[in-house]
Amino acid sequence: MSEAQPLVTPKPKKSVALSGVTAGNTALCTVGRTGNDLHYRGYDILDIAETCEFEEIAHLLVHGKLPTKSELAAYKAKLKSLRGLPANVKAALEWVPASAHPMDVMRTGVSVLGTVLPEKEDHNTPGARDIADRLMASLGSMLLYWYHYSHNGRRIEVETDDDSIGGHFLHLLHGEKPSALWERAMNTSLNLYAEHEFNASTFTARVIAGTGSDMYSSISGAIGALRGPKHGGANEVAFEIQKRYDNPDEAQADITRRVENKEVVIGFGHPVYTTGDPRNQVIKEVAKKLSKDAGSMKMFDIAEALETVMWDIKKMFPNLDWFSAVSYHMMGVPTAMFTALFVIARTSGWAAHIIEQRIDNKIIRQSANYTGPENLKFVPLKDRK
């Protein structure tokens, strides 16, 4: 367990709207209270990221506690049973063109599932948790059923016997069970992405939930928010930056020139963390292990070289997205699916926040600072020029 550090109050960032504003209460997560820490329901991310399976973290967030050995076995069996897709959902996914972004596919899949298996009108908590479990179990099925059908006309079987959500995703993607290293790497990355307090997509989910809307609508809205390159899409952009270079020296020279020209480099800095992203040290080690296992250090070395330059020149640290891009690439995940994996993980956090917002039972309605014109004289339509 990490030692307690003094709490800090980060300065609001001009580039982030509402930075530093407290918008509500949560018992789910704390971010950056000492500058570089992250806790899920009181547990330090550095204690659980590599030691827990993703299903343990999902149980912690959605069901309120870390499971016992028997509870975990039962939970994994439940999730495994929820991987299948209703025929209507498959039919809808077959209409989505191959050119669609995976995030749009997942948003569509969630919406269709919400019409086929709608939430009960009373929005009871056990039912909400069941929906969250079904979504975490089947989001990979939705994406990869669409992917194989739209790209090569294959209707794949999505119900595999893989032990984990991450293993299930990789199995459907590649058509074979992943190695233990890949499955462990996927578990760790999903753990790191699972929850992050009042970020844009989570707050979107809470705003929707606060209106009394259903779980599917709240999750769909969150997916829409996460799709943006300033939020979840950052890991895709990060890899596009990394892959344009052939070697670390070329990367360092070019990025130095770009930074000097005031270009923003996606994958560095964070709206809340002030001294570093605690998730980076974990995912960087994952990326390194995967690269060594593949016998190809090129992308890792380039990413690390860029990390050094950004710190030396700008004193900016990499966030989770930077080395997760390398990790997913080394496991053969298409770049456009990077953020989709984020969705699978973050659904656990979103669902927990939706349930928490429902318990609070208040609509979220903030005020705006008006900056428009005042006291204009009305001109009837016939007199306007």
From Swiss-Prot:
What gene codes for this chain? prpC
Q: Which GO terms describe its biological process?
A: carbohydrate metabolic process; propionate metabolic process, methylcitrate cycle; tricarboxylic acid cycle
What subunit structure does UniProt give? Homodimer.
Which annotated residues bind substrate? Answer: 78, 196, 279, 346, 365
Q: In which pathway does it act?
A: Organic acid metabolism; propanoate degradation; Carbohydrate metabolism; tricarboxylic acid cycle; isocitrate from oxaloacetate: step 1/2
Q: Which amino acid positions bind CoA, per UniProt?
A: 264-268
Q: What class of enzyme is it?
A: transferase
User: Pfam families from the entry?
Assistant: Citrate_synt
| Record field: catalytic activity | propanoyl-CoA + oxaloacetate + H2O = (2S,3S)-2-methylcitrate + CoA + H(+); oxaloacetate + acetyl-CoA + H2O = citrate + CoA + H(+)
This enzyme's EC code(s): 2.3.3.5, 2.3.3.16
Name the record gives this protein: 2-methylcitrate synthase
Q: What does this protein do?
A: Involved in the catabolism of short chain fatty acids (SCFA) via the tricarboxylic acid (TCA)(acetyl degradation route) and via the 2-methylcitrate cycle I (propionate degradation route). Catalyzes the Claisen condensation of propionyl-CoA and oxaloacetate (OAA) to yield 2-methylcitrate (2-MC) and CoA. Also catalyzes the condensation of oxaloacetate with acetyl-CoA but with a lower efficiency.
